[in-house]
């Protein structure tokens, strides 16, 4: 029987999201596989993967909120807005944790964010990262995003906890925070802790899936996608009109 369902992968560092889906095609012996939100290679964490007929449900997941923990590196500006990129500027860091905490409110709520050149955003049919690799930089229009919550986590290192809308670039958020502080900044690490109703507690390490004799045991039913939504129980008389798209009183 062909595999169908949703598996929540804890993506390892160094893998692209497409690498993960390509690997799982072999694991589940299923060609129809897609993921619910790209993670950069340096990032780890929650990557929902839709298998078989469940791929039809991806469209219902695309607007899901995302949660992240990100490392903030101050004093360094790079071309990719993270520590994997080429250093463009370096500045002394004289700001304190209190200074960082005080500025976070500027980046909470609905804000405009300019997508980075190293991204898959298309302008005039070309992906920005393709232009960036050619040494080109073009004007990008700001996009409206929502940062639902943003706080600095405890610890010696600067780590941000972010809950945000679809389309938010955490790399750019780190870059913009550094700019606002006057010393520049970039992202040093990224872990997705939540995607929609799925969290790290739901995720399975990729190596576990690869090694599993029966990987289908980790598949969730498609209706798990809607676990955090209010439910309505239909009467027998309401089922048919509902299937036909009619309003239910």
Predicted region positions:
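Acidic, low-complexity central loop/insert segments
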Residues: 60-112
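Accessory RNA 3′-end/elbow-binding domains used by RNA modification enzymes
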Residues: 1-12, 16-46, 98, 103-104, ...
């Amino acid at each position: 029987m062909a595999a169908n369902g949703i598996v929540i992968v804890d993506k390892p560092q160094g893998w692209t999201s497409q690498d993960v889906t390509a690997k799982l095609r072999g694991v589940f012996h299923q060609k129809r596989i897609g993921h619910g939100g790209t993670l950069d290679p340096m990032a780890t964490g929650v990557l929902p993967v839709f298998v078989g007929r469940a791929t039809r449900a991806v469209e219902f997941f695309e607007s899901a909120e995302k949660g992240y923990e990100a490392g903030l590196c101050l004093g360094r500006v790079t071309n990719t807005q993270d520590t994997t990129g080429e250093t463009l500027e370096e500045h002394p860091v004289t700001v304190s944790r209190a200074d960082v905490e005080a500025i976070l409110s500027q980046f909470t709520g609905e804000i405009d964010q300019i997508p980075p050149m190293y991204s898959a955003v298309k302008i005039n049919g070309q992906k920005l990262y393709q232009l960036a690799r050619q040494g080109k930089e073009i004007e990008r229009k700001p996009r409206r995003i929502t940062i639902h919550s943003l706080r600095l986590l405890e610890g010696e290192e600067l780590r941000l906890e972010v809950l945000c809308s679809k389309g938010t670039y955490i790399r750019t958020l780190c870059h913009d925070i550094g700019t606002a502080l006057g010393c520049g900044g970039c992202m040093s690490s990224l872990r997705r802790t939540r995607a929609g109703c799925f969290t790290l507690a739901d995720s399975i390490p990729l190596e576990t899936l690869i090694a599993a004799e029966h990987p289908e045991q980790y598949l969730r039913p498609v209706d798990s996608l809607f676990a955090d939504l209010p439910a309505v129980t239909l009467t027998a008389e309401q089922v048919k009109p509902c299937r036909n798209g009619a309003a239910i009183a």
